[in-house]
Regions:
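Active-site pocket-lining/capping segments in soluble small-molecule metabolic enzymes
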Residues: 1-143, 149, 153-194
Length: 194
């Protein structure tokens, strides 16, 4: 059975749709707030963290992943104040029961957050973003090992690069190696092959 990770927006009708399809969902992902470093351009009507937390709390239990998947950040993001503000935001989502992990693209930011607040890090899993292009066992192993070297929980699943969709023998071999190394970690594929 296929399971999907889908974006979340705090719309009551959409929340009801997701709740009704919860058995087919691997989780939801969302922008943590208008000032957080994710790979999307800011929208004009980004929901507030309070709106997001309220909407997420109405969903059945499933992974709820906040996006921190920008590869490049403003210098202020990694400053003491920037890390503090980001950790306060993560802690607020945790207190609301609205966050189970983060999708990240910068190992340095992940390590900085882990070092700045081991308490927050231990509550969240760290999921490598798709821009890591996990197209080989060696690359995937290096990225997962790096995530596991922090205080964050290991990723419950990783999304393999879309290029492996075109090589079923290679995909089978890569998946076998990953499952032997991390038997509890799920594997996913990009679905937008066009």
């Amino acid at each position: 059975t296929m399971h999907y990770e889908v974006p979340f927006v705090p719309d009551p009708a959409y929340g009801a749709l997701l709740s009704g399809a919860a058995d087919r969902l691997a989780g939801v992902y969302f922008r943590l707030g208008p000032e957080t470093p994710d790979a999307r351009m800011p929208g004009l009507a980004d929901p507030s963290p309070m709106e997001l937390a309220a909407g997420l709390s109405g969903l059945p239990p499933m992974p709820r992943l906040g996006l921190l998947n920008a590869a490049f950040h403003a210098q202020e993001t990694l400053s003491k104040d920037g890390l503090r503000d980001l950790l306060m935001l993560l802690d607020g989502y945790l207190a609301a029961g609205a966050l189970t992990g983060i999708v990240y693209a910068d190992q340095y930011l992940l390590q900085a957050l882990s070092d700045a607040s081991p308490t927050v890090a231990r509550e969240l899993c760290a999921v490598p973003g798709i821009n890591f292009r996990l197209d080989s066992f060696e690359r995937a192993a290096a990225v997962v090992d790096a995530a596991c070297s922090t205080r964050f929980r290991p990723p419950p699943r990783v999304i393999l690069d879309r290029d492996v969709n075109r090589d079923l023998d290679g995909l089978t071999a890569m998946a076998g190696k990953l499952r032997r190394e991390w038997p509890d970690m799920g594997l996913g594929l990009m679905a937008n092959e066009g």
